[in-house]
Amino acid sequence: MVAEDERRVPAAVVFDALGLDYEKAFASSGAHRASLRWLLERLAPGSRVLDVGCGTGRPTAAALADAGHRVLGVDVSPVMVELAARQVPGAEFRRADIRELPLEDGSFDAACAYFSLLQMDRAEQEAVVGRLARAVRPGGFAVLATVPVDIEGAEGLFMGQPVRVTSFGADAFKDVAVRAGLAVLAQEHAEFAPAHPEAVPEPHLFLHCRRPAR
């Protein structure tokens, strides 16, 4: 018989286990908050925003909802979705896999994916970035963040949890965004040390993009 954990999406298993520890470990990321400020400065009042891999809802969904925007947060982890709904009552949250979630073209003013693609393979990451680019209306924004390291299917521990990680180098990840039809308006690099005894410092890359207007 297949164990329950083996039938579930690996990312869901990892983040169910981490819960609020993940939020605490990354709460001090100034680069993440600066990225959110970049987006907030450009959104029209009451914008509809998709938050992919919403986690506990903080800081992304919370910052957007507090500013009066209509936020849909999605995550494969039921624990994270429950925490987010409790912590950010002004947003909507769904347990869903962004690879399969139906998305209408141009149905959002902006989309965010902060470090939520790393447990997908490269083809899946490219496909998801393409889906987000299409889901954002022409003239809308997309913010993508990753750990810009050229690795594929690397197994290791993340905050004590076993993970299998795939990522792109910085230039290659930017190329993914461009191939999806996004214009990269700005990119920011940062080094961040999560506040967790089993975490190690990691490079972060933030791409601030726009879907060109027709």
Which positions does each model-derived feature cover?
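A short acidic, Gly/Pro-enriched loop at the edge of an enzyme's catalytic core
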Residues: R99-A111
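A short glycine-rich, Lys/Arg-flanked "PGG" loop and its adjoining helix->strand segment in the class I
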Residues: E126-P138
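Conserved beta-strand signature within the Rossmann-like core of class I S-adenosyl-L-methionine
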Residues: G139-T146
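Short alpha-helix
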Residues: V165-G181
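Core SAM-dependent methyltransferase catalytic element
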Residues: A193-R214
